Amino acid sequence: MSKAKRKNSSYKTEPKKPVINSRSDRIRYANQKLYDYPLSVTWFRIFKTVITVLQAVMSGYSAIVCIVSVFASFSESVQNSANAAAIPGFIAYNIVMSVLLAAVVPLCVIMFRQLSELTQKSYGFLKFFLIYTSCVNAVSTSASELFRVALFSGVKDYDISITNILFAIFSVVFMAVWLILNLRYFKNRRSLFSD
């Protein structure tokens, strides 16, 4: 049966579960489930092989930027040019975000492994991963823009406008939509995840 004719969100005939004695057995069984699944799993494959890798790279890079920003905040040029009242909060924010963003990297590795096995545990971890990364990305982007406004608003030679605030709002809305769509997509494919 072609995938174009498969309209149900669960298997008409569940693939026969083989004897599973190792992780390689679970991976082979997961691949068979994906092959036989009645709904399209194109986004699933993209999410597993592309999104998780990009998320790890971007989060690792952002964590490094946060650490660099902490040290840069103590430089004389920043101390003299930025609004002094906002600097302590900016430093604290970057320290916290560097930890939260760095934590995403091992989570991406675990997520990739979980999506290779498609167990019930994998589905629970997937929901946690989506919520955690969406929240961290939204806070990281929006707070960075807002701190930029707080640090350099009214400072000569720094172009701060309403665009920064609008971009902060947009990033939160975008990540909320991203989260909802992904949760819905994987919920419709809940039957993929089984022990």
Model regions: which residues?
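N-terminal targeting leaders characterized by basic, low-complexity, disordered sequences
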Residues: M1-E14
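Loop-to-transmembrane helix junctions at the membrane interface
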Residues: P106-T141
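Cytosolic juxtamembrane helix at the C-terminal end of the final transmembrane segment
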Residues: S40-W43, V109-S122, A176-D195
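Canonical alpha-helical transmembrane segments of integral membrane proteins
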Residues: K48-V70, A102-V104, S134-E145, F174
